[in-house]
């Protein structure tokens, strides 16, 4: 598999990762181990990836792992096509824990909370990790493939 310039730079500096190739727009995708993510996030920020464009999470496969995905952009004045990278961090479904990058990119606040609420990934050291869309009393993680839909629905008055 062809590695991009960022992957080559990380290899040169002994940063452990795995290249996953490029997406349809030519954005390099890298896999980072959960235990290394907080320190590598700081390296990427210092290197110039100063904008967290988006963060999301998904269930990879029933009985498999969960993934937290970060789309980072290197914003610079006078540059029309900023550099982008996609980072994927995987966690086991039985104890899904990933370090929070709230302290690196503040925009991760609500995005990591939504991923926690919908998929159940716990983001370590997040200052306000609690449900954001579902009630605190909700049981389960609605976007997991093994989620069982409750057999009740609250009827709400639209008026």
UniProtKB/Swiss-Prot annotation:
Subcellular localization, as worded in the UniProt entry: Plastid, Chloroplast thylakoid membrane
GO MF term (any one): NADH dehydrogenase (ubiquinone) activity
The species this protein was found in: Zea mays (Maize)
Function: NDH shuttles electrons from NAD(P)H:plastoquinone, via FMN and iron-sulfur (Fe-S) centers, to quinones in the photosynthetic chain and possibly in a chloroplast respiratory chain. The immediate electron acceptor for the enzyme in this species is believed to be plastoquinone. Couples the redox reaction to proton translocation, and thus conserves the redox energy in a proton gradient.
Tissues in which the UniProt entry reports expression: Leaves.
Pfam families per UniProt: Complex1_30kDa
Keywords: Chloroplast, Membrane, NAD, NADP, Plastid, Plastoquinone, Quinone, Thylakoid, Translocase, Transport
Membrane protein topology class: Peripheral membrane protein
InterPro entries: NADH_DH_suC, NADH_quin_OxRdtase_su_C/D-like, NADH_UbQ_OxRdtase_30kDa_su, NADH_UbQ_OxRdtase_CS
Reaction(s) the record says it catalyses: a plastoquinone + NADH + (n+1) H(+)(in) = a plastoquinol + NAD(+) + n H(+)(out); a plastoquinone + NADPH + (n+1) H(+)(in) = a plastoquinol + NADP(+) + n H(+)(out)
Protein name: NAD(P)H-quinone oxidoreductase subunit J, chloroplastic
GO CC terms in record: chloroplast thylakoid membrane
Disulfide bonds: none
SUPFAM superfamilies, per the entry: Nqo5-like
GO BP term (any one): photosynthesis, light reaction
Record's keyword annotation contains DNA repair: no
Family designation: Belongs to the complex I 30 kDa subunit family.
């Amino acid at each position: 598999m062809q590695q991009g310039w960022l992957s080559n730079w990380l290899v040169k500096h002994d940063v452990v990762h795995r290249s996953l190739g490029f997406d349809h727009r030519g954005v390099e995708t890298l896999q980072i181990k959960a235990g290394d993510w907080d320190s590598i996030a700081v390296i990427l920020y210092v290197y110039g990836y100063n904008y967290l464009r988006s963060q999301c999470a998904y269930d990879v496969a029933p009985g498999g792992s969960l993934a937290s995905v970060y789309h980072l952009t290197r914003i610079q004045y006078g540059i029309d096509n900023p550099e982008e990278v996609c980072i994927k961090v995987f966690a086991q479904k039985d104890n899904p824990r990933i370090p929070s990058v709230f302290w690196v990119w503040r925009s991760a606040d609500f995005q990591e909370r939504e991923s926690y609420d919908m998929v159940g990934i716990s983001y370590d050291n997040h200052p306000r990790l609690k449900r954001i869309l579902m009630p605190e009393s909700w049981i389960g993680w609605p976007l997991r493939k093994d989620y069982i839909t409750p057999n009740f629905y609250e009827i709400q008055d639209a008026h």
